[in-house]
C-alpha cells in the first residue's frame, strides 16, 4: 500500500507547534490529505497529546524565549515516545533562532529537517549567498544537504529550484518547482506538515520525505496551471488538488 493510502486508512494524528502566521493553512493541508491536525500552546497537556499523536511537527517561525519550554518539552516527549519529530527551522541563520535550535539540538534528536538552501547551509556549518525564508539559490548542489544530514543524523529536505532529500550518503531529487510557492507565505510550512503526515505512517523516513515532497510539488505544478500563474487563488487550488489526489486512491 502506498504511503498516501496508509494515511487514508489510518488517519494519523499530527501534533503541530505552528507559527502564528499560518496555523490555518497547516491544519487544512493535514486535514485535506486525510489526517487529523492537532495544535496546542499549553505545556501542561503536552504529554497526553504527544502520547496520542503519530508525529510531532515543530516550526520555529514565531518562537520566543517564553515559548521555548513548550517546544523543548514537545520535542523531548516525541523522542521519549518514539514519535517522528520534524523540524521547520525558519530563518535559523538569524542569531536568536540559531541559539534556540542549538539548545534544542543539544537535548533532542530531530528525525527530519525541512528548510531552504540558507537554512540547510546553517546545519552544515556553511554560509549561503541567501538569507532567511526567501532563499533563491537555483543551482543543484547536494553538499550542504549531505553535510547537514551527517551532522544532525536527520533526513534533510532542502527545498529550492530542485528539492534535495538526503540521508547523508544517499540523495533523491524532486524537480517540481513553482514560483507561486515563494509568493504565498506558508507554503513551506504546509510542506513540512505534509512531510510529518507521511512520516507518521512510514518506517522509512527517507522515502517518506521524498514521497511527501514529490506529492506536494506535483500538486503545486497542477495548481499553478489552474490559476494561470496568478498567486491569489493558488493556495486554494493547491489544497483542492491535494484533496482530489487523496480521493483518487480510495
UniProtKB/Swiss-Prot annotation:
InterPro entries in the record: Hyethyz_kinase, Ribokinase-like
Keywords noted in UniProt: ATP-binding, Kinase, Magnesium, Metal-binding, Nucleotide-binding, Thiamine biosynthesis, Transferase
Native organism: Lactococcus lactis subsp. cremoris (strain SK11)
This protein's name: Hydroxyethylthiazole kinase
Catalytic activity, as annotated: 5-(2-hydroxyethyl)-4-methylthiazole + ATP = 4-methyl-5-(2-phosphooxyethyl)-thiazole + ADP + H(+)
UniProt record similarity statement: Belongs to the Thz kinase family.
Function recorded in the entry: Catalyzes the phosphorylation of the hydroxyl group of 4-methyl-5-beta-hydroxyethylthiazole (THZ).
GO BP: any one term: thiamine diphosphate biosynthetic process
